[in-house]
Design a protein with these regions (language model features):
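Active-site loop/lid in soluble adenylation, ligation, and acyl-transfer enzymes
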Residues: 11, 15, 38-99, 112-114, ...
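Charged, low-complexity interaction regions
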Residues: 16-26, 36
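Short, conserved charged micro-motifs
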Residues: 98-100, 137-141
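N-terminal nucleophile
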Residues: 167
Length: 241
């Protein structure tokens, strides 16, 4: 059985030995005695433990207010889980060009999320989540998406769900897009989950990639957005929605 608390104390001792110029012991060998297969296994378990120890404020908000709210949490260094159900079409624009005129003509709200990524389109049946927490060692978008993939794996066959950079794909189609807002001390993260087919809408707003790298849009069909929301909250807080 893994003893994460003892392993963390052992790591502190190892670091202190090095700072004091003492001959350090083999940390990689010692943690194996505490149940860890290797250093990567330990660091992943350490991050899981650190997140499990965090206290989060949980807040319902709207996608139109989320960006400002996330920035407010980050400025305050306040841990937060922001939950958002989308009930209208919204265009989240990054650094890439998109059909702004179509959005204006059809009264589609445009939100600038200040990212180097492309445009993400939300439809009426979406779930978005925002997370703000300390920028812990090893905490990345991939880490969080992998945890969400583990949830989806319970509903889909092996190999159907894949993490691809800042996206989650199901059977090769994009069902989730994520954005990160990291600073040296605070980690901000948002993810948008699709629960219906918006291929036609995306084709009208998003221009084809010059490199041909656009991912085919898909949607989650084996659990509802309420069920996904509850699963993510259980992972982060062990509390039901």
């Amino acid at each position: 059985m893994k003893n994460i608390k003892e392993a963390i104390e052992l790591e502190k001792q190892y670091i202190q030995f090095r700072l004091e110029g003492k001959e350090p012991f083999s940390f990689a060998n010692e943690i194996k005695k505490l149940g860890f297969a290797n250093l990567n296994d330990y660091y992943n378990a350490k991050l899981d433990y650190q997140i499990s120890e965090l206290e989060f404020s949980i807040e319902e908000t709207s996608p139109l207010e989320a960006a400002a709210l996330i920035m407010s949490y980050m400025r305050q260094k306040k841990n937060g889980i922001l939950l958002m159900d989308t009930h209208e079409v919204i265009a989240y624009c990054g650094s890439k060009d998109f059909n702004r005129d179509y959005c204006i003509e059809n009264n589609i709200p445009i939100i600038d999320y200040y990212s180097n990524g492309g445009t993400m389109i939300a439809s009426e049946n979406e779930f978005n989540i925002g997370l703000v927490m300390p920028h812990l060692e090893g905490l990345t978008s991939t880490y969080i998406l992998q945890k969400i993939k583990n949830i989806l794996d319970k509903y889909y066959d092996k190999g159907e769900v894949v993490v691809d950079h800042n996206d989650i794909l199901i059977n090769g189609k994009k069902v989730c897009g994520a954005t990160v807002y990291p600073t040296s001390e605070v980690f901000g993260f948002t993810a948008q989950f699709s629960f219906d087919d918006k291929s036609e809408l995306i084709s009208k707003i998003c221009y084809p990639s010059k490199s041909g790298s656009n991912k085919e849009p898909g949607f989650i069909d084996k659990l509802t957005r309420k069920e996904l929301r509850e699963e993510i909250l259980l992972w982060l807080t062990n509390k039901e929605a």
